[in-house]
Amino acid sequence: MVKNKFIKFFALFLLSLLTFSCGTINRLNDSNNNISIEQKIKRYIKLYAPIARKQMKVYKIPASVTMAQGILESGYGESTLAKKGNNHFGIKCHKGWKGKKIFHDDDKENECFRSYNNPLKSYKDHSLFLANRDRYRFLFDLNSKDYKSWAEGLKKAGYATDPEYSKKLISLIERFNLSQLD
């Protein structure tokens, strides 16, 4: 009888310990996920900010906007397009694209996106994509330090279908102080 009570007590103790531990682990994972996303974004900025600044000097596109687009479009470098195709800006193939391709579900199923050998080529193509398309031409009349007008202009020109696109870019720029790159 004492043995049965001990076994029941021990089983109840283990069950309580396990329940408490799982709750604590889940709370730790939740807070680590928030911190880890922030850290991943900061790591992305540290890694790609020099490229964005170089592109700004050549093409006059604010580095803050380029960085915010890269963070948003690539999921801070963690998206399938970024990992498998080095596409950090969600640029689709469009007419005349003769480079590498990757297919991915987006607005439609199995859409064609540009694929690059490395992220640097993605950043350069992003600059060329904006600089060489008529629908973005008006952006280059804006002050290159006016990230808000650039973000709103990208949305107006149809860069993305998300109605909150410019707000998301501006939020990233302000949250991570990306305007210091301009």
Label each residue range with its predicted role.
Residues 10-19:
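Bacterial N-terminal signal peptides
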